[in-house]
Every structure is written in structure tokens, then in C-alpha cells.
Curated annotation (Swiss-Prot):
One of its GO terms (cellular component) is extracellular region. Keywords: Hormone, Secreted, Signal, Sulfation, Thyroid hormone, Transport. The modification Sulfocysteine is found at residue 33. The keyword Transferase does not apply. Residues 1-19 form the signal peptide. The gene is ttr. Belongs to the transthyretin family. The N-terminus strongly influences thyroid hormone-binding properties. This is Transthyretin.
Length: 151
């Protein structure tokens, strides 16, 4: 069990790192990107490409769809939401995991998976949400940083 927990921690750190070849770091090309999502397929040990991701904001108890997109071949989505849209509040990122796993011929447990979090309650910040997926589990972490100044 300790080995599995160590593996998960290392995998999440690898997702959140900027070590991928040819990868442009969040601070370089995406200084205006307030929310970035990174997803890893832990079964195959590769980025989870073409995964549908939707971003919702809680408005008076209702979830309002703000934006949606699919992960790239690097398992990432940049600029899924603008600074103007990403105001203080509670957000939900919904991952269409059932569709993703079914396309790979697997029968997953979850219909979809949500990551719900409060954003910008201590001033404007940049958020990177990293997610590790299997057909029966999810693990997520967040890297929250100060916004980058334009050069």
C-alpha cells in the first residue's frame, strides 16, 4: 500500500512539473491563463488526450456552465477560462471519464468525476489542477500561484 501511495504522489508530481519535452511552461506562454488542467491516464502511464472537460461556477446554488474543451495530446487544457470569467467563487471542473474509458474498451466505475474548489477568495491567482485517472479512481492536486507579470 505504501508503494502505491508513493507511486501516486510521484505521478502527480510528474503531472504538475514542467519537465515534458517541448512543453511550454504555464508562466511562459500562458501568463494570462488563470486556470490550467493537466490529466494523466494512470493505466497506460500517458497523458489523457481528448478528454472532455467542463468548467462550472456556482451561482446562487446552481451550477452555470462557463466553458468546455478537450485535453490536448499532452493531456492539458490552457485558456479554458478567461481572467474576466474567473472571478471569486466556487467552481466545478467536470471530467467525462466514462466516455474516455469506454473509447479505450474499458468499463469504468464513474459516470464522470468532479473537482470542486473555491477560487480567488484571497485575491487573483493562477490555478493548475492536476488529475490522475484510472477507471476506478481519481486523485487530484492543485498548484495555486500568484499571477505572472507581463514582460
Amino acid at each position: 500500500m505504501a508503494f502505491f501511495k508513493s507511486f501516486l504522489l510521484l505521478a502527480l508530481l510528474a503531472i504538475a512539473s514542467e519537465a515534458a519535452p517541448g512543453h511550454v511552461s504555464h508562466g511562459e506562454a500562458d501568463s494570462k491563463c488563470p486556470l490550467m488542467v493537466k490529466v494523466l491516464d494512470a493505466v497506460r502511464g500517458i497523458p489523457a488526450a481528448n478528454l472532455l472537460v467542463q468548467v462550472f461556477r456556482n451561482t446562487e446554488g446552481n451550477w452555470e456552465l462557463i466553458s468546455s474543451g478537450k485535453t490536448t495530446e499532452l493531456g492539458e487544457i490552457h485558456n479554458i477560462i478567461t481572467d474576466e470569467q474567473f472571478t471569486e467563487g466556487v467552481y466545478k471542473i467536470e471530467f467525462a471519464t466514462k466516455t474516455f474509458w469506454r473509447k479505450l474498451g474499458l468499463s469504468p466505475f464513474h459516470e464522470y468525476v468532479d473537482v470542486v474548489f473555491s477560487a480567488n477568495d484571497a485575491g487573483h491567482r493562477h490555478y493548475t489542477i492536476a488529475v490522475l485517472l484510472t477507471p476506478y479512481s481519481i486523485s487530484s492536486t492543485a498548484v495555486v500561484s500568484e499571477p505572472h507579470d507581463d514582460l
